[in-house]
Structures are given as C-alpha cells and as structure tokens.
C-alpha cells in the first residue's frame, strides 16, 4: 500500500501469465511467512515495504494450499519489474483491472481490503475456496 493505492504485478510466468496479482509466492526452506512475504515483494516488484499485520488467510483445500496476505506499507513509491513481473503499478481501487486479476484469492483479498478501508476497520479475514 502506498497512500491510497495498492501495488500489483502483471505476471511474467505461468500460471496466469499476463494477469495481475499482489506480490506473492512460495516460502523457501527456513523462512517465516513474514520473511517470505518481504522477499517475494522485493523479487517481484523491487519494493521494500514495512510489513504490517496478516490480513487474509485463504484456504484452498483442492489445491493443497493456504495463501496468506499481509498488509504492507510503502513509505516511498519505489518499485520496478522483477524477473517474474511484466510490469508493476500502483492502482487506485477504481482503476484496478478487475477482469484481469490472476487468482480468486487476490480478488477476494483486494475486495475485503477496500471494504474494510471504507468502514475504517482492520480485521483478519478467513476465506475458504
């Protein structure tokens, strides 16, 4: 998050090549979830935000996965495209390419983020897919 915008990456890899996502990826051995979130954000978007609280836990039992999304604050709008991103942009809610979001977990996390922001609340979301 930078001011009122969210940072999205257009994927340069499969699955969902060319679609937009929040910076995300898989953990490496020995990492905490927080370390993985910061590393993936730098690898995909060359951004170094200040990590905030866990925002959403997305259960994907059919894929044997759990997706965790953290809130993270960028103090400066410094970012770029890493090797797994075609482009990286800051978006206002109304400019997000909603039809081109790569994954349902990202769409639902973004929707809940903007809903919470309008209500002035910050809560942890558990989302089942």
Where are these regions (language model features)?
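Unchanged
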Residues: 27-50, 54-112, 116, 120-129
């Amino acid at each position: 998050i930078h001011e009122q915008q969210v940072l999205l990456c257009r994927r340069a890899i499969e699955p969902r090549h060319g679609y937009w996502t929040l910076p995300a990826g898989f953990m490496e051995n020995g990492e905490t979830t927080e370390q993985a979130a910061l590393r993936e954000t730098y690898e995909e978007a060359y951004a170094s935000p200040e990590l905030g609280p866990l925002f959403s836990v997305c259960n994907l039992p059919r894929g044997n996965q759990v997706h965790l999304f953290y809130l993270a604050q960028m103090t400066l709008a410094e970012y770029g495209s890493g090797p797994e991103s075609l482009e990286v942009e800051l978006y206002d809610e109304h400019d997000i390419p909603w039809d081109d979001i790569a994954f349902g977990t990202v769409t639902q996390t973004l929707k809940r983020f903007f809903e919470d922001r309008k209500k002035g609340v910050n809560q942890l979301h558990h989302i089942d897919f």
